[in-house]
Structure formats: structure tokens, C-alpha cells
């Protein structure tokens, strides 16, 4: 070890010093002299430095002054929700067409006669739809008619179209109204003559496929009912896209009831229609679960039946709602029917006064709708008559001045078809 060695022990520094021998002799140590050397002084042990005192931790910051929480203020009421946006405006109705065009759905009795009447009155038919009849068969069915005779013009088919008096008519064979491409033939007014699509929802399939308006040729459960000469002015082009032309019997009864009620007042009444048989009946006895009597042979029987025609008058003449009801007898004749209206009058009137009131209406505001006759007529005399109602002055009777029976004839096919076309033209005139 050198003269100065430093030993680090437990972090304590000890310094050792070796002094020379105190012996006076010059010999090298160890010295042989007997001199007793004093023991070396104990090594100085340095005291370890006192540990450094760590500075005391800083005093914690004084707590923030406690702020007493403010009493919660009542929250202001939330602002009212914004008003709901207005509903989108309805789609604008199609622009008025320059010419009335007609489509016919269903080429049965009424469908074919509507086409005949359109040809007579110069109304252009652009399409006929019937899934069960092809153009060749349409020619035959339109040309020959056992009740109204042979069509006097020309009828043929060409390139899949029906051609009547050189007018080409498109033929479609779609099963559902929504499938018929009415938009491809110029958005016509559609005559719904199948007897199937009677409600607004069912008939609106025509609208979705391009029809401008729809006239249902039967009473409807919910469509507005319009009878020419009675309430056609109730037609609203802005809201009515599907309307009903009511039934042939309602078209006969309503004009007569309107005249009598406006002039004398009807307290109550019962109607009976003696009605020609129709295609819904059986030629011989057959099954008819809903109407057992209706299943009996039409040519062999007088068959009592129900009808809603009298009650329907209350829909077109609201003042008579609940005052009329009626029934029908189906009889073995192919066409022309007759209404018997038995009613109690509010104002006493002679039968002569009643006849004069009906005669004046037939010559005036109801000309072409209501007719008057004093001839000794029978049903076939009115086959092909275009009026809705022909008052038979010689057939009616009166019990007294307040209780009368009134009789009026109607061609339930041809007269009704004329009213369908008249309603088409009236509705079209309201769009201009």
C-alpha cells in the first residue's frame, strides 16, 4: 500500500499514515534494538459527515376558499319546439288536355256500349283493356249485339289494334289496373267497367299507371257518387280523381225523386224496380251461395232481389237520406227496366199537378236526362233510349193527394252508358 491509501468503508473515508521508526539507529527496520517503541497512535477515524437534512417538504397550498354553492337557479323553460314543417304540397294535377280521350277497362256489356256511345258523340277512345278478350274477338263482340243490334259502322283489327270507323284503338290485356300503360296513350279518362275495382283504393291503380280520372260504372263504397241532372255540380276537380256514376236504377230514380221532392217534398218512400236479368244471373239453376234465389234460372223466374239504389239516392240528394229504401224483382227480359216509386208527399198535390211538374222538368233543366210520355208503352219501346228516366204518366196512380205511385222506365244498358259519357264530358269541361 502506498503511503497514503484511502479505504472506503461504509461510505466512511479512513486515512492511514505510516510514520518512520523512532529508533535512533541507522539500521533498517525491523530494528534489533531493544528500544521499545510506543504503539502507533490509533488511526483517526473520520466521523462520517452528518447526513444532509432534506429540506422539509413545502407546506401544502392553502385550501381554496370555500365558496358556498349558489342556490340552483330555475332553468329557463326550454324553447318551444319548432313547428313541424308543412306537409309537401300535393302533386299538381296534370295539365288540362286539349282533347278528351278515354280508356275503357272491361269490354263487357257496359264497356262495349260506352264505346258505341263515344263513337256516336265524337269522343275519342284511345285504348281498351281486357285480359280475357283478344283484338279479333273484340271485333266480333263489338260488331254483333243481340240486344242493340249490329254496329252500323266498320269494325276490324289491325296490328293488334281494334279499328272502329278507321279509328285505331290500342288493345291491352293487363290483369291489374296498375299494370295498364295508360301513360303511353296520353293519360286518358278511364271508364272502370269491370265491376271489380269499385273502391277508391282499388280504382286508383289506374291513376298510378297514368289515368287522368276514373269513373266507376257501379255504386262505390267510398267514391263520390255523381248522377247527371242531379248532383254533377258537386264534382271537385281538385280533390276527386275517382268518382262513381252510381247504378242504372239510381240514375232512373234520382232525377224523378229530385223533381218531386223540390216541388212537393217527399216525407218517405218505397221503391221497387222491375229489372231485366243481367250477366250475373244463371241461365239455368246453378249454385249461388250468397243469394240462393239468384241462382235460379233467369229465363224461367221472377226473382226477388235486393238493391241499394233507393238508399243511394240519399247520397246524391242529402235531404232524402234515410227516407227511401227499396227492392228489386229480376224478370225474364234481356233489357229495359222500370221503377215504381210509392211515396208520401209533404204538400198535397193532385196527380195532374205532379204530371205537369215532371213534364216541365223534362222540357227544361233535365232535358236529355228525364223524359215524359203519355203513350201506352211497354218495355221494348224503350230499348235503345238514351234518357236516364222516362216518366210514364198513364201508369202512375194516386191514393189521395199525399200518397202516390209514380212509374218511370229506363234502358238499364244504353241509357246508363250515355250518362257515363255525359259525365266524362262534364268532368273534362270543368278542367279547362
UniProtKB/Swiss-Prot annotation:
Which residues does the annotated region (Disordered) include? 40-101
Pathway(s): Carbohydrate degradation; glycolysis; pyruvate from D-glyceraldehyde 3-phosphate: step 1/5
Q: Where is this region: Testis-specific N-terminal extension?
A: 1-97
- Where in the cell does this protein reside? Cytoplasm
What are the residue positions of the site described as Activates thiol group during catalysis?
275
GO CC annotation: acrosomal vesicle; cilium; cytosol; motile cilium; sperm fibrous sheath; sperm principal piece
Active-site residues annotated for this sequence: 248 (nucleophile)
Record PTM Phosphoserine, positions in chain: 350
Binding site residues for D-glyceraldehyde 3-phosphate: 247-249, 278, 307-308, 330
This protein's major location comes to cytoplasm
Keywords (alphabetical) are: Cytoplasm, Glycolysis, NAD, Oxidoreductase, Phosphoprotein
* Domain description: The testis-specific N-terminal extension mediates tight association with the cytoskeletal fibrous sheath of the spermatozoa flagellum, possibly via interchain disulfide-bonding of Cys-33 with sheath components.
Q: What is this protein called?
A: Glyceraldehyde-3-phosphate dehydrogenase, testis-specific
Q: Which organism is it from?
A: Rattus norvegicus (Rat)
Organism lineage string: Eukaryota, Metazoa, Chordata, Craniata, Vertebrata
